[in-house]
Regions:
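Terminal transmembrane helical anchor/hairpin motif
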Residues: 34-53, 172-234
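Hydrophobic/aromatic residues in alpha-helical transmembrane segments
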Residues: 69-73, 121, 157-158, 197, ...
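Aromatic- and glycine-rich beta-strand/loop motifs that create alpha-glucan
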Residues: 1-25
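Helix-loop-helix units of permease transmembrane domains in multi-pass membrane transporters
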Residues: 76-108
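Secretory targeting signals
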Residues: 24-69, 101-166, 205-220
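Pore- or pathway-lining transmembrane helices of multi-pass membrane proteins that form conduits
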Residues: 20-26, 165-183
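Cytoplasmic juxtamembrane interface segments
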Residues: 1-10, 77-90, 144, 148-169
């Protein structure tokens, strides 16, 4: 398995994908920070850092994060079809399951620094604004970890779509539609988002709730993410 991962990691266009991820994060962060500071004067003391977190993560997790994951999944998979290397690998009895798992691990390592950068932006913005954290920093780190976990069902879903269509644009288009449907579900009945794959990063980051999950919410979150990841990984 190690050899599969190293082979995939070596040929991954890491700089290109990181630049894309940082660009998406920068754009969503500007929106969130702009809204926060525009309404800074009307915020109640003791809630500022939570509102900052909510604004900073909401537009990222709902609007741009799923398409970003679709782009990463697409750029990891589509070149294999264009070069027709999959047929050659199958002929040489290379394990497609291990190959795909190597790509999933590569995507995780690409997403990790982007999400850590999101946490850093939050910390720096809070320091600039001169506010203290309403919750411990460890809590926000935990929410970042949950957002990483919730990335897997989207990546596996987007990989499934990309493999079936062999088309980069269609995969990104589906993720964009998924992001818009997430907004619709929020306004119709937010409870539906608990079972919608494109809503999972928002739930993991607690962008709307702004408080820790209860035990039952955590179990449901883990179950939904495992089920979706397993279904589309197959």
């Amino acid at each position: 398995m190690k050899d599969y991962f190293l082979a995939e990691w070596t040929k991954t266009r890491k700089i290109q994908l990181l630049v894309i991820g940082i660009a998406f994060l920068s754009f969503s962060s500007m929106i969130g920070l702009g809204i926060y500071f525009a309404n800074r004067d009307v915020l109640i003391d003791g809630t500022q850092s939570l509102v900052l977190w909510g604004q900073l993560t909401f537009y990222n997790s709902t609007l741009l994060y799923p398409p970003m994951l679709a782009i990463i999944a697409g750029l990891l998979l589509v070149p294999e079809f264009e070069r027709k290397t999959l047929d050659m690998l199958k002929a040489n009895q290379v394990s497609m399951r291990k190959l795909y798992l190597g790509k999933l691990m590569s995507s995780f390592l690409l997403i990790l620094p982007i999400q850590l950068l999101l946490l850093l932006i939050f910390i720096v913005a809070a320091k600039i604004d001169g506010i203290s954290f309403d919750l411990s920093l460890a809590t926000h780190v935990k929410w970042i970890a949950l957002s990483l976990l919730s990335s897997f069902p989207i990546i596996t879903l987007q990989s499934y779509i990309t493999v079936k269509t062999r088309n980069f644009s269609k995969g990104v288009g589906v993720a964009t539609i998924g992001s818009m449907l997430n907004f619709v579900l929020i306004f119709i009945n937010e409870s539906f988002t608990k079972f919608f794959p494109y809503s999972q990063p928002m739930i993991g980051l607690r962008s709307r709730a702004l408080q820790d999950m209860t035990f039952l919410e955590f179990i449901l979150f883990i179950t939904v993410n495992i089920v979706f990841s397993f279904i589309f990984y197959q």
